[in-house]
Amino acid sequence: EKIMKKFMMLVAFAAMCFTANAQDVKTHEFDKFVAVYPADFQPKIVWGDVDGFNKGEDHLFEVVIDPYCATLATLKDFGDDRKESLEDKGFKCDEPVVKGNTVYVRGVNGNEVRYWFAVKDAALPDEECFRGLFWCLTTDEAKYKPILLEKMIPGLKLK
């Protein structure tokens, strides 16, 4: 009976831990979302390791920020187009989310998580120009936060 009680307590504790972790995993629901670029922002591609994750294992990410002149009229159209593109590559995607001047699409394929961001930049002359940001991670989604983008891209702010 004592062994059974201890076992049940262990099961309850494990269930509690799993529930807490499951809640923490929702990192794709951004609360800091609208992207702000400095006036002298330069498009760039960054390759490297996510802070503190490279402890004996390779965790690779790619970040691309580029001016993107779209023939798509709205952020939602851009998001739908990116979603379709990811699904064509075998990714399971969330519905595109539009908030403020930003749209993002998240897709997962095995252990690869891809994010597409597009930012409507009022400073760009063409109404149909976006600055696109592509973020690809091959690591456990629960281990990172959106704030890492700000560390990787000097001058980028999410608010």
Model-found features: residue ranges?
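Short, Lys/Arg-enriched N-terminal segments with co-localized hydrophobic residues
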Residues: 1-4
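Sec-dependent N-terminal signal peptides
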Residues: 7-18
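Cleaved targeting-peptide boundary
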Residues: 22-29
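Surface-exposed amphipathic alpha-helical segments
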Residues: 23, 39-42, 83, 130-159
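A generic structural signal for beta-strand entry/edge sites
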Residues: 25, 49-51, 101-104
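Secretory pathway targeting signatures of secreted, lumenal, and periplasmic proteins
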Residues: 29-77, 108-111
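Surface-exposed aromatic
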Residues: 60-65, 103, 130-133
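Signature of long, low-cysteine stretches enriched in small and polar/charged residues
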Residues: 80-129
